[in-house]
Amino acid sequence: MKVFNVIKKIMLWVCFLGVVISLPGCMVFEDKVLISLGEYKNSEFYTQGEFQDYTDYAKYYYDYVDFTENEYFNKIKESDLTQINEHLDDFESWIETYRGTDPSREIVVNYDFDRTIIDCEDYIYIDSEKYATTLDDGMTISGFTKYNIYFYDTQTQILYYFHNNI
């Protein structure tokens, strides 16, 4: 009987620890960059992927956003366009990969971003991580580990959000 009680206590502790360890994964994600823009009137959100590997595309519609005190966004400069296009090239390559395996996926069907709307009146915030790996033959391969791109188009007052974590 004592052995049973000891095993019971151990199992309860294991269950308790399992719950405590898993709680952070259940917490609601708070997007401070999105919150910094104030309340949006409508949104569209499309995703593809699983627990760790996923791609998101979203549009947030605003009536007005004041960027004067915003700690995240900067007005786009001509010199930013290379970095923006590099990220969008990567993002769109994932959209094409998904299109090749299943063209009916919601992110494929609803991806409608048009780069021609990008100009120096718009605002951008990019948070990204790169990787570089040198192969045995000395060749280096590099790319993005993950990124969040927030692009605000001032003409339409739409925030476009691009996320990739693959």
Regions found by a protein language model. Give the residues of each.
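Sec-dependent bacterial lipoprotein signal peptides
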Residues: 1-24
